[in-house]
Design a protein with these regions (language model features):
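Catalytic histidine neighborhood in serine/cysteine hydrolases
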Residues: 246-264
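Short alpha-helix in the alpha/beta-hydrolase fold that links the catalytic acid
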Residues: 104, 215, 224, 238-247
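Acidic catalytic loop of the alpha/beta-hydrolase fold
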Residues: 232-237, 264-265
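Catalytic active-site module of serine/aspartate enzymes centered on a nucleophile-bearing elbow/loop
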Residues: 270-300
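Hydrolase active-site cap/lid region
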Residues: 166-224, 268, 272
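Membrane-embedded segments
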Residues: 67-146, 150, 155
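Short beta-strand/loop motif that positions the catalytic acidic residue
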Residues: 221-223, 228-230, 234
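An N-terminal hydrophobic leader/cap segment in hydrolases
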Residues: 21-63, 292
Length: 300
């Protein structure tokens, strides 16, 4: 074998090893990002019955991982006070599953909503081990399909997202024209800007980020009215992020900033203001011109 041939074989082997190492490194980075972002919680310690709410268990089929197996997403359906109640898809944030979101779900039900709430894959009783951005979007879309079956009238279909769930809800609203109204609470502009806000600004996060959740780029495409809610003392997600999302969103839109509210207690601190903002928003949606509702009536 000539020196050139041996050199070529060595180079090919080195390139193959580099490709494997690079792929392994990318897979590791992706896994660690998903772990850091979602921090999925399994233990279900309470149900809607613990809060005096009637409910039904919901199981939704979604696409599985690369092996092609099907997976199931678990949720709760909490009927409204009457047949004309607005119906809301509840999308929670990171770290906490549905059982830790029941206080917020109960409050929305108290305001008159029927609620369909789901756990993303990896959370609660849903299948899967570690969710991804794409899978969270898929799970929300499957839940929206179920909401359509539960509520035939598109004028009464709403989506709500808290924190990370707000990013999922914004993506959902860009995919579906039949979202009558969107409520996002304590949410962020993008994962890259969240990394900056948490002190990683000197690290080239954009070069390695695999989970983007870029709501600031997407919110301009949302056709539904949007209500943004944020506490001014939120130490996890700066309220300024909701202000920027509000500025980027098309009309009609509303913004409620709750003085001294933190990441989770906005409605508790200022329930009257919170409820008034939600009711005003429902009236805004109800009173939209017929032409603006036409595409929603067709679905998406």
């Amino acid at each position: 074998m000539t020196m050139r041939a041996r050199g070529g074989r060595w180079l090919a082997a080195a390139m193959a090893a580099l490709a494997v190492a690079s792929a392994a490194g990318c897979a590791y980075l992706d896994t660690k990002q998903r772990e850091w972002i979602f921090r999925a919680q399994r233990d279900i310690h309470s149900t809607p019955a613990s809060y005096g709410l009637p409910f039904e268990e919901v199981w939704l089929a979604v696409a599985g991982d690369a092996d092609g197996a099907r997976a199931r997403v678990h949720g709760w359906w909490i009927p409204g006070p009457d047949a004309t109640a607005p119906t809301l898809l509840y999308l929670h944030g990171a770290r906490r599953n549905l059982s830790d979101n029941l206080f917020r779900i109960q409050r929305l039900h108290r305001m008159g909503f029927a609620v369909l709430a789901i756990d993303y894959r990896g959370f609660g009783r849903s299948d899967g081990e570690l969710p991804s951005e794409a899978q969270a979007y898929e799970d929300a879309q499957a839940a929206w399909q179920q909401l359509r079956r539960l509520e035939p009238d598109p004028r009464r279909r709403f989506a709500y997202g808290h924190s990370l769930g707000g990013a999922v809800a914004i993506e959902l609203a860009t995919r579906n024209d039949d979202v009558a109204g969107l409520i996002v609470e304590s949410t962020f502009t993008s994962m890259a800007e969240m990394a900056d806000a948490m002190g990683y600004g000197n690290f080239p996060i954009g070069l390695v980020l695999t989970q983007h959740f870029d709501s600031l780029a997407k919110v301009r495409a949302v056709k539904a009215p949007v209500l943004f809610i944020h506490g001014t003392s939120d130490r996890f997600v700066p309220a300024e992020m909701s202000e920027r999302l509000y500025a980027a969103a098309p009309e009609p839109k509303r913004l409620l900033l709750v003085e001294s509210g933190n990441h989770s207690n906005v409605a508790t601190m200022a329930f009257d203001k919170y409820q008034a903002a939600v009711r005003d928003f429902l009236a805004l949606v109800r009173d939209r011109p017929a032409r603006a509702r036409a595409s929603a009536d067709r679905g998406g």
